[in-house]
Amino acid sequence: MAKAKFERTKPHVNIGTIGHVDHGKTSLTAAITIVLAKTGGAQATAYDQIDAAPEEKERGITISTAHVEYETKNRHYAHVDCPGHADYVKNMITGAAQMDGAILVVSAADGPMPQTREHILLAKQVGVPAMVVFLNKIDMVDDPDLLELVEMEVRELLSKYGFPGDEIPIIKGSALQALEGKPEGEKAINELMDAVDSYIPQPVRATDKPFLMPIEDVFSISGRGTVVTGRVESGIIKVGEEIEIVGLKDTQKTTCTGVEMFRKLLDEGQAGDNVGILLRGTKREEVERGQVLAKPGSIKPHDKFEAEVYVLSKEEGGRHTPFTNDYRPQFYFRTTDVTGTIKLPADKQWVMPGDNATFTVELIKPIAMQEGLKFSIREGGRTVGAGVVTKINN
């Protein structure tokens, strides 16, 4: 069956369900589509369609993710749900499924569990801006005091990891009752979507952020000067604007004297465009792949940072052995590899393949970087890990 095209007239937000295994993330995802389908805002998707999530490859890592889309009165949503805990870890660290917000699912019958904690921590580390809580399976709890206790525990846990635990909306309901079409089940889903609509902030569009373009290639065009090519990551570049060349060497200033796309001259290039940018007075040898063009002052080069990293298992084509302190692989940022040294936290002697870990990295050359930047770890051209910059240290 052909997928119905959604009219993209409403603002778009990417969200996902997170939480402990068997707390009802996939049931909730199915319930949202089934309840919203009644008002024409979704295509009803059954639990087993979502649970059979296809495998995808993101930066050399295989991740199983299910995608559904739906809309409320105010917004259009793309929603991701992962079958296994490892898929969540990989998804959040690689940014394969960008999340502007999350729905944390907690079983009222069990309360917060180890993966509940881990997902909240990961969400904080990778910069998920906001989350709403769905306290699921309330049909299995008879004692209102117990519900209150679980809610309190969840709020404390959120606060502990740096989210505003006292403010976050917590909706109580039963995904199963919603799937069965019971009115109280559906009412909770509608309440949840109202909370998601109002509490999860509208993301800043890529074109509204400062201009940034990773350099992929550099050419010299006789009589015209130096042209750099790449895909604009964020913002807009107009002819005549000053820009900086950042990373690997000292930051240089230059001016954009032309923007070209598909052999046509444009007045500007914007986020998502593959363009060639002509630089005034910049020599071919002064620019190289791995640097970025950026709005002056918007991004700085750094060589020391803290990261949250997922290390590929042997089965995924990663290392067969753990690595220890002072391990020196290549870190692939945007378009280039830079060698760096890993410093593990004092309580960790090694990191096993298949684990995720937090550690500090020192690069041999600085890279244009901001918190939230994704990278791969490579050894001789093969990906052995994926990470995200959580804190810049210098």
From Swiss-Prot:
Region spans: G5: 174-176
Subunit structure: Monomer.
First-listed, main subcellular location of the protein, grouped into a coarse class: cytoplasm
Region (G4): 136-139
Function: GTP hydrolase that promotes the GTP-dependent binding of aminoacyl-tRNA to the A-site of ribosomes during protein biosynthesis.
Protein name: Elongation factor Tu
Region annotation (G1) ranges: 19-26
Similarity remark: Belongs to the TRAFAC class translation factor GTPase superfamily. Classic translation factor GTPase family. EF-Tu/EF-1A subfamily.
Gene Ontology terms, MF aspect: GTP binding; GTPase activity; guanosine tetraphosphate binding; translation elongation factor activity
The keyword Magnesium appears for this protein: yes
Annotated segments matching region G3: 81-84
Gene transcribed to yield this protein: tuf
PROSITE patterns: G_TR_1, G_TR_2
GO cellular component, one term: cytoplasm
Keywords: Cytoplasm, Elongation factor, GTP-binding, Hydrolase, Magnesium, Metal-binding, Nucleotide-binding, Protein biosynthesis
Catalytic activity entry: GTP + H2O = GDP + phosphate + H(+)
Domain tr-type G: 10-204
Keyword Nucleotidyltransferase in record: no
